Amino acid sequence: MQTGNLWQVLGLCLLLVGAWAQDDTEQNPYEVSISGNSVELTCPKDFENGIQWKRNNEQMKGHNEKYLLLDQFSEMESSGYYQCLATEGNTEAAHTLYLKARVCKNCMEVNLLEVATIIVVDICVTLGLLLLVYYWSKSRKAKATPMTRGAGAGGRPRGQNRERPPPVPNPDYEPIRKGQRDLYSGLNQRGV
């Protein structure tokens, strides 16, 4: 037998042994229902003598039914280990659950389809507004009369204009007196 086949047979045998060795006792999980500020726990097992609830190993008085309703649930104060067990004796059959939940008063539950619909509609509306503004600005640009900039507005005609001489230097930047040395006149003069 090849080593590859040997490993496959060995793996299959281990898988079968693991499946046969599994515990047949089925554990029923707690049912937790959150609505607004209230949390409802359902004990996974029915006890004949009645049920008692414990939170952090302290008995909760007045809660003897299969359902435990926690009104005004607070994440900080109400979180902890919850147990439901038989009223008399038989503490071995206790089921323990660690509960930490966030609740809010005005929350609304939405499913995946509703969220996807909201996102797609938002994208479509945004693209529609974008196209509307684009075509509106394009049509406005076509209706506008072209404006030519005059020479006094800082614009020069493009290309060479042989009839116009070069502009006169601006007298604002000329030295005030020819022989006077200004504060910054000595900067960057290496050849002097």
Swiss-Prot record:
Which gene produces this protein? CD3E
Instruction: List the SMART domains hit by this protein, alphabetically.
Output: IGc2 (SM00408), ITAM (SM00077)
Can you give the residue ranges of the Ig-like domain?
A: 27-98
Organism per entry: Ovis aries (Sheep)
Decide whether keyword Phosphoprotein is in the record. Answer: yes
Keyword Phosphoprotein on entry: yes
What this protein is called in its record is T-cell surface glycoprotein CD3 epsilon chain
Where is the major localization of this protein? Answer: membrane
Annotated TM spans? 112-137
